[in-house]
Design a protein with these regions (language model features):
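Acidic, turn/loop-rich segments in luminal/extracellular domains of secretory-pathway
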Residues: 1-8, 13-102, 108-116, 121-192, ...
Length: 281
């Protein structure tokens, strides 16, 4: 006995179809007996695909999304006059550039003063396309890969914040994001003593309270840091330092009642220190 021959498929077993549209393609088979072939569909994803039983035209019931489902499988049966033939059909969805890049990263950045580094702007693209970055403005710079820098080293005491607009493109679509870069204030300025280096008072300090009111060393710190005052070089030493200073206020006093006829000039060095720098006068 000779087994009956079924229809022979002429189409490939793998088809490709673009996302966002329903068209797939056509299956085609011929019957060796010359009869008209009809078609049916079954299998894993048959419920998602429509098949014209006469023409073999395949369509998605709804347009596919590559990012959701990018491959479908079904079994096509070609029905002949004597026998049938099955073909497992794979339909691969083509990924189109149909998604605009997005900015999941924060629009707020920080960078230390006195250096150019800031950080990296990060955008994503659901299509997996290569992204390219650009920026508007003159104070900030960005590489095509998103590395963000200051054009020149910032000084917190001059400018504390910068703004710009970053653009990202996937080659077809683009998106803008306004960003802000806040400058971190570092302790990069030494205190400056602003008061005169000479103080005077009437001899004969009566009681320690009057002695404390001899004068005050004034200083400023551009970084706004707390300052601490100290006496470092008494000259000449008389039972300890000739004078002392309040570490917080900078108020100075002799350590004893002054007598003009005994000594009328006292010299020493006062240092004012913040946490990292110092200045003296």
């Amino acid at each position: 006995d000779v087994e009956p021959e079924g229809p022979v498929f002429s189409n490939a077993s793998t088809l490709n179809a673009d996302e966002n549209q329903t068209a797939i393609g056509t299956v085609s088979a011929t019957d060796p007996n010359g009869s008209v072939v009809t078609y049916s569909i079954s299998g894993t994803d048959a419920s998602l695909i429509s098949l014209d039983t006469s023409s073999g035209v395949l369509t998605f019931n709804s347009a596919p999304d590559y990012e959701t489902k990018n491959s479908y499988e079904a079994t096509i049966t070609a029905i002949g006059s004597i026998a049938n033939t099955e073909q497992v059909l794979i339909i691969n969805v083509n990924n189109l550039n149909d998604n605009i890049p997005t900015f999941p990263s924060s629009a707020i950045f920080t960078g230390d003063e006195n250096q150019t580094a800031i950080g990296t702007v990060v955008a994503t693209d659901a299509d997996g396309d290569t992204l390219t970055y650009s920026i508007t403005g003159t104070d900030l710079s960005i590489t095509s890969s998103g590395v963000l820098t200051f054009v020149s080293e910032p000084d917190y005491e001059n400018t504390t914040s910068y703004s710009a607009t970053v653009s990202v493109t996937d080659g077809l679509t683009s998106l803008d994001q306004a960003i802000t870069v806040n400058v971190n204030n570092l302790n990069d300025n030494a205190p400056v003593i602003t008061s005169n280096a000479t103080f005077s008072r009437v001899e004969g300090c009566v009681g320690i309270a009057d002695c404390w009111d001899f004068g005050t060393v004034a200083a400023t710190d551009a970084d706004g840091n707390p300052m601490t005052f100290s006496v470092v070089t008494p000259d000449p030493p008389i039972t300890g330092y000739d004078f002392e200073i309040n570490a917080t206020s900078g108020k100075i006093s002799l350590r004893f009642s002054a007598d003009y006829e005994t000594k009328n000039t006292y010299t020493g060095t006062v240092t004012v220190v913040d946490s990292a720098e110092d200045g003296s006068k």
